[in-house]
Amino acid sequence: MLLSDRDLAAEIKAGTLALEPFDPALVQPSSIDVRLDKLFRVFNNHLYTHIDPSRQQDDLTSTVEVPAGEPFVLHPGEFVLASTLEVISLGDQLAGRLEGKSSLGRLGLLTHSTAGFIDPGFSGHVTLELSNVANLPIMLWPGMKIGQLCIFRLSSPAEYPYGSAVYGSRYQGQRGPTPSRSWQSWHTWPTR
């Protein structure tokens, strides 16, 4: 069940949903607006001929910190990692979905490629996968609204929430845009 503004406020008051820093003015009818942090991860395209998710490629990306009062310029066709300004923490009976803002989508900004789901028990900055599909550069200002967080109540609390040892949660407590850690649990299944 998708939570309404009243339910979101109740979960925040109960401590089962937390955003830090939190601004009550960002609560919408069925979501909470989240803002863009000042850290970005850019791809070092000149260092690799390809990306291999089964291997550790530590220098595939580099962190860029945008100076105060300046934007990050995302050029047409570019893809970068960024993160929410807010640290988001979900209880074991809540899951989240991060969606883009309609106003930004109409300018050609995609907020996430595929990873918009947030598991129950997660706590940390949410990594954003930003793409510019427009024909002009897009100025990204730290602190601007970048997405909206929708919260869903599970039918029962998760038996093993994100962060428990069972799943080897690789991104729990992440600070800033975190590069892929797919290689840490790489596995392929037989094909026919």
Swiss-Prot record:
SUPFAM superfamilies: dUTPase-like (SSF51283). The keyword Nucleotidyltransferase does not apply. The record marks G116, F117 as: Important for bifunctional activity. One of its GO terms (biological process) is dUMP biosynthetic process. CDD domains: trimeric_dUTPase (cd07557). Its EC number is 3.5.4.30. Pathway: Pyrimidine metabolism; dUMP biosynthesis; dUMP from dCTP: step 1/1. The keyword Kinase does not apply. GO terms for molecular function: dCTP deaminase (dUMP-forming) activity; dCTP deaminase activity; nucleotide binding. The active site is at E129 (proton donor/acceptor). It holds the Pfam family DCD. DCTP binds at K101, S102, S103, L104, G105, R106, D119, T127, L128, E129, Q148, Y162, Q174. Keywords: Hydrolase, Nucleotide metabolism, Nucleotide-binding. It catalyses: dCTP + 2 H2O = dUMP + NH4(+) + diphosphate. Residues 171-192 are annotated as: Disordered. It comes from the Bacteria. Homotrimer. Belongs to the dCTP deaminase family. Bifunctional enzyme that catalyzes both the deamination of dCTP to dUTP and the hydrolysis of dUTP to dUMP without releasing the toxic dUTP intermediate. NCBIfam families: dCTP_deam. PANTHER family: DCTP DEAMINASE (PTHR42680:SF3). This is dCTP deaminase, dUMP-forming. It comes from Salinispora arenicola (strain CNS-205). The lineage of its organism: Bacteria, Bacillati, Actinomycetota, Actinomycetes, Micromonosporales. The gene is dcd.
